[in-house]
Amino acid sequence: MAVPKKRTSASKTRMRRSHHALAKVNVITDAKTGEYRLSHHVCMTHGTYNGKKVITDNVNTNDNNNNP
């Protein structure tokens, strides 16, 4: 079984783990609502992306589905 000959110093251990840190989340404020949202993602309150409507509101004016 492989065993290290010398003890790894704290400096070497920390240098090895230097890239293990979590990346910061890219959060921006929406220009229209002022709410926080992820960058390059659709605004879920209005369904817009880059100033254009990409998610339509599915409002059913015909409520025949609920009647028996």
Curated annotation (Swiss-Prot):
Keyword Ribosomal protein listed: yes
GO cellular component: large ribosomal subunit
Pfam families on file: Ribosomal_L32p
BP terms from Gene Ontology: translation
Keywords: Ribonucleoprotein, Ribosomal protein
Record InterPro entries: Ribosomal_bL32, Ribosomal_bL32_bact, Ribosomal_zn-bd
One example GO MF annotation: structural constituent of ribosome
Family: Belongs to the bacterial ribosomal protein bL32 family.
Name of the protein: Large ribosomal subunit protein bL32
Gene name, Swiss-Prot/TrEMBL: rpmF
